[in-house]
């Protein structure tokens, strides 16, 4: 299933049940190794600990056809307590996340770490269903389709539950260079 990548799904980078990248109420910065992109997002919610979540991510190398990332950057901050929609600018793919927790809002601000691959362009984009399915539930998003890449997300925020639901924006990438600055 993941033959293009040269190693099976079980060997995702740092992806295990107990390997959280943050403690509750704690900020974190997570970046995939160079040349890899985020392919899985896992999270558990804890109402008693500030209605916060612990997070874990998995990365996978992009296929050789995409080449090496030509540049990487942190996107604009998405504010705590707000609903938002963001894709990586400049046709970038998501290769990491950065987040800070705000006690006053019982929520987090978010930033995507994005990498651009030469002049490749996204197409055939779609949005996943909500993760988690209901506020407060465990979240486990795995991209089983290895020719689709995460380009961003849209989130809703519940003022009652103080939790967020995510829909991830997944796209294919062209096999050729194209001239569009941003899609």
From Swiss-Prot:
Protein name: Dermatopontin
GO cellular component: extracellular region
PTM remark: Sulfated on tyrosine residue(s).
Region: 3 X 6 AA tandem repeats of D-R-[EQ]-W-[NQK]-[FY], residue numbers: 52-168
Organism, scientific name: Sus scrofa
This protein's record includes keyword Secreted: yes
InterPro entries per the UniProt record, alphabetical: Dermatopontin
Subunit-structure text: Interacts with TGFB1, DCN and collagen.
